[in-house]
């Protein structure tokens, strides 16, 4: 990740502490222990203890889930055939355990702490290998890391304070049972980046940035709640907590993953607000065709001129052979995809496409895009 950031021109300053933030009419200045840095916007993504969030006085809404778990990362020295190739949640009444298959030879175990157990005793080598004994020995693997984390379930009550935005764990924290912590931070970045660019380029009004929090906070809260229910289900199945009256919902029955309910989206089609799938078109992943901004995917070439007229250079126009797109793409219609790859609208015909496009451009604060565009 660091190499990728440097490759695109990011100036990384590691080990630098932010000591204060000051806003002024044209931007914001971050004061650090090595100097000051000024920009138009500041994104605070400095983790769960976020000093910037605290300095801004932004509070957390606590969903009432706090558990200590020992996290062990190991690197296998040799194949261990008895290890599962799949992630496992072991609901052991004596101690719930999570097993995760990492990249290459890396494996992770997570052990829930019992009342009275301390962090220091749990990370001691002897205790670590005692816990790992059912799966492997020091001859099988090298211990890379042993640390006790406290799993939280919290969501900030705001993700914006004028020119400062919160992202990642600074804005929301969740137990890891759905594997959605990093994913949620990536969704934050994907949601905010294109909006900052439109505003910074003078294409959209600053009010567009308010949709960052109005879109991300409800979604993040829904994911946190789902993760909490999964954690409670683990305790219930382990016999460590009373059985829920709604086990079906806890297992996921009738509970779809949260979608983008409000914000830059139009219409009530079932695909709107969901992330676009990744089909292969003419041997290429759809993402390779969509570009990095808005995209209009049209079924056949019937709406190409309309898409170009409405969206101009704001969107890539992607034409797929009629009837071949494994997406919620109506015959002869179009799907409008946001830069963060959420479906913004689905149109069945030219009239619906025009109305949906105009509504979206109005939401973005854009009257009409520049009519210069290349078509794929």
Model region roles, listed by residue range:
Residues 1-242, 318, 370-376:
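Core Rossmann-like FAD-binding/catalytic domain of the broad FAD-dependent monooxygenase superfamily
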């Amino acid at each position: 990740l660091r190499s990728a950031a440097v490759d695109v021109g990011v100036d990384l300053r590691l080990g630098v502490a932010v000591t204060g933030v000051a806003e002024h009419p044209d931007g914001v200045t971050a004061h650090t222990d090595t100097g000051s840095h000024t920009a138009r916007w500041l994104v605070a993504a400095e983790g769960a203890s976020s000093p910037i969030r605290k300095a801004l006085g932004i509070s957390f809404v606590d969903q009432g889930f706090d558990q200590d778990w020992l996290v062990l990362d190991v690197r296998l020295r040799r194949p261990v055939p008895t290890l599962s190739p799949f992630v496992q949640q072991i609901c052991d009444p004596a101690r719930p355990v999570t097993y995760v298959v990492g990249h290459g030879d890396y494996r992770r175990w997570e052990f829930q702490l019992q009342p009275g157990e301390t962090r220091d005793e749990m990370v001691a080598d002897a205790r670590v290998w005692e816990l790992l004994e059912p799966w492997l020995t020091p001859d099988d693997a090298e211990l890379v890391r042993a640390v006790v984390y406290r799993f939280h379930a919290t969501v900030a009550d705001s993700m914006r304070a004028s020119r400062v935005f919160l992202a990642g764990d600074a804005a929301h924290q969740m137990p890891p049972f759905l594997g959605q912590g990093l994913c949620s931070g990536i969704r934050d970045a994907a949601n905010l980046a294109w909006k900052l660019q439109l505003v910074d380029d003078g294409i959209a009004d600053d009010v567009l940035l308010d949709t960052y929090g109005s879109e991300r906070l409800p979604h993040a809260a829904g994911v946190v709640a789902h993760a909490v229910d999964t954690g409670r289900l683990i305790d219930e199945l382990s016999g460590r907590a009373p059985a829920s009256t709604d086990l079906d919902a806890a297992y996921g029955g009738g509970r779809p993953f949260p979608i983008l309910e409000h914000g830059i989206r139009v219409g009530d089609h079932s695909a709107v607000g969901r992330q676009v799938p990744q089909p292969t078109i003419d041997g290429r992943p759809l993402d390779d065709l969509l570009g990095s901004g808005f995209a209009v995917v049209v079924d056949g070439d019937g709406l190409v001129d309309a898409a170009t007229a409405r969206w101009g250079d704001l969107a890539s126009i992607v034409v797929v052979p009629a009837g071949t797109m494994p997406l919620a793409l109506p015959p002869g219609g179009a799907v409008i995809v946001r830069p963060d790859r959420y479906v913004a609208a689905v149109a069945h015909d030219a009239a619906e496409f025009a109305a949906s496009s105009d509504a979206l451009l109005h939401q973005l604060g854009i009257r009409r895009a520049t009519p210069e565009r290349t078509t794929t």
